[in-house]
Amino acid sequence: MEKEMPQELIRFFEKSINWILPGCQLFYRDTDADIDAQKSYQVGSVIRAGFFIDVTVKAQRPTTKFRFIIGSAHCAKLYEAVPDADMVRWRLCTLHFNSYFKVMDVYKKEGVTQIFLLHIPYQAVPFFMSEHSFNFIQGASRTNLVEIVRRSLDEKLRMDVFADTTEAELLERMKQPVGLDDKGNPVPLDYMPIPEEYKDISDAVRSLANDLDPINYPEEDCHE
């Protein structure tokens, strides 16, 4: 007879899913960087952003070889908060450098490789590194997230290109692959202490992203 899961663990899983799914939206980051997707983004693995990740909610047919599609309920929508014409036109958003993602899918079609990342809370990283967490996510969402995201690329490949999202400045901001350093190596998975010079922008991004829940911080650094 299987041992029942402890109630405390069940509550933690539920809290994690409530951080991930309600309000979850898709964000896009297109790049022509040299990426070994099979090596760097193994389905089921967990990665840390490593730097502030600029993304957009405005995307149609990609003109680049790679597209990161990120499911997140805690992305800072800069275009709604900063009176900057470029940010508004690009629908620019950003994710904190201590954001963690589970690699859900790598899908290639018509020369474009799409990498699906799901934003997860820091304290749940050990659980989401396990094999059975994938089915847990799919079950909790009551839908097939991978199918939805693959269909997104299928549909967008039939659309026109948004001219705004092909501007050189935006593409440069999105060039660096998520979770990789300048040499193409994975950034450390360890939570990075906030350098003093980045504290203000870090706090602003967290606030805009409604990302103050203690579940997304180390216990010694929790924001109540």
Give residue spans per PLM region:
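Mono-ADP-ribosyltransferase
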Residues: 1-224
